[in-house]
Amino acid sequence: MSTALASAGVISGLEAAAQENIVPFQFKDKSSLKILGTNWGFEGTTDEFCVAIKKEGYDGTEMWWPGTKEKQTELFSALKKYDLEVGFLCGSGERDYATHLDAFKKQINAATTEFDRKPLYINCHSGRDHFSYEQNKAFIDHTTEASTKSGIPIYHETHRGRMLFAAHITRSFIVKNPSLRLTLDISHWCNVHESLLRDQEETIKLALSKVGHIHSRIGHEEGPQVNDPRAPEWEATVKAHLNWWDAVVEQKVKNGETLTILTEFGPPNYLPTLPYTN
């Protein structure tokens, strides 16, 4: 089984821990919760991937916006064939700021206008951690405009190396940009701050109130991904993540909003491997 699909096994293995986090709220119906699978680490074709996640019971997938018409046709054909939803990931790796921003804008513009199946949302790897506030704000301004025009929710991911790489930095962005919406991958912050964030409770509470989408990976104080969340040594870490996610779920239920969750478990070598085996 590929690492992309192993997420399903890991999530099912967390049932015991989740049952201890009994909460007095639940979604009204299945359509209010969309569980998506990642193709990160999957080595087959798009069609093969869609077959696999459909079989595992996923509602859809999150993928990078396809860069060519051929890839777009391939993806949208598979989504239609297997009746799957989609969320798009947009971002840029260019070093030069102007080039980086331009590439990002082109992806956002394409993803909000050139689709055959309207995405549930767009998730952004926005800016860089070393760009200035004003430089990074340009990414927020563009996505705000694009979201308003298209009606597609656009979220900015809490991701290392990107604009929202740390909790306190994100707080500053939220205070200055109250309409900012987040994709919560809090595993990154556990790594960045080398903690389970107990010393930033008010900041985390503010961030959770802005979450539209979740990446459900479990990080820890020394890395962005535990080796196996079912292992007893990660019990406290798993519970911390479940509590953060439950806070988002409670908010979504209260507001009558749909929640999307991407199950994510990084492949080798993101997942550490034995020395001398690669």
What are the functions of these language-model segments?
Residues 22-39, 46-68, 105-132:
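Long, low-complexity, intrinsically disordered polar/charged segments
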Residues 92-106, 130-132, 139, 225-235, ...:
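Surface-exposed, active-site-proximal loop segments in enzymatic domains
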Residues 29-38, 61-63, 84-91, 120-124, ...:
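Hydrophobic faces of well-ordered beta-strands that scaffold small-molecule active sites
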Residues 41-46, 60-74, 93-103, 128-135, ...:
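Acidic-and-aromatic substrate-binding clefts and catalytic sites of carbohydrate-active enzymes
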Residues 22-29, 47, 52, 110, ...:
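Histidine-acidic metal/acid-base catalytic patches
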Residues 25-28, 50-55, 69-88, 103-118, ...:
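Acidic (Asp/Glu)-rich catalytic clusters
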Residues 1-20:
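N-terminal export signals
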Residues 96-181:
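Active-site acidic/histidine proton-transfer and metal-coordination neighborhood
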